[in-house]
Amino acid sequence: MPRQLAGLLCVLFGLAGAPALACPFRATDAETPAASAGAAQVLALGGAGRLQLDLQRAPATLLHSGDLLIARYAEGHYLAHRLLEGNEMGADEGERLDLPRQVRLLFGALPLDGLPDAERERLQAQRQALGLCDRRASVSRYRVAGTEVYRLRGSQAGKPYHALYLLDGPQVHYLDSSGSDAFVEQLLASLRRR
């Protein structure tokens, strides 16, 4: 888990000195998976949208450290939640980013035209590092409970990897999981407002 988190942080910080390769990328719009009945536990997320997710089954272990919450399941996969920080999207010290806008730019929901060269190059390097340019990963965009959600799907060490970006007012909830497609689809389907 720490290795995966460290790798993700490297990706989100951008690759220093990475070539600014053209990477025209756009998230595909996706249908929200159908909700299933019942929840073993509810994960309530702080923020303007008062969002919550049904965990479907109780985790074997629940770990909380600072702003990070990790649920580990008996099958060996995990679900982690934290709020995305501006420096993870390339903000300089003291700079305040509009995080939802940065996520939309990264995943192609907004055009890169007209951005300063340095910002466009940073976004292209992040897309490259995430595997979006060479199609090692894919992104789908959902609208669930009035919330814009981006789902990055790829693999790490031969196992499925998913990252969910939930745009909630000025903040972005970041969830990642090594669970199956079905597990993540159940999470998406259960997203609602309290």
Describe the role of every protein-language-model region.
Residues 1-8:
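Bacterial N-terminal signal peptides that target proteins for export
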Residues 8-16:
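Bacterial N-terminal signal peptides
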Residues 19-84, 88-92, 156-160, 168-194:
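N-terminal targeting sequences that direct proteins away from the cytosol to non-cytosolic compartments
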Residues 65-161, 165-167:
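Conserved polar/disulfide-associated segments of primarily extracytoplasmic proteins
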Residues 5, 17-18, 128:
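Disulfide-bonded cysteine motifs in exported proteins
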Residues 14, 26-29, 137:
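Extracellular/secretory pathway and lumenal proteins
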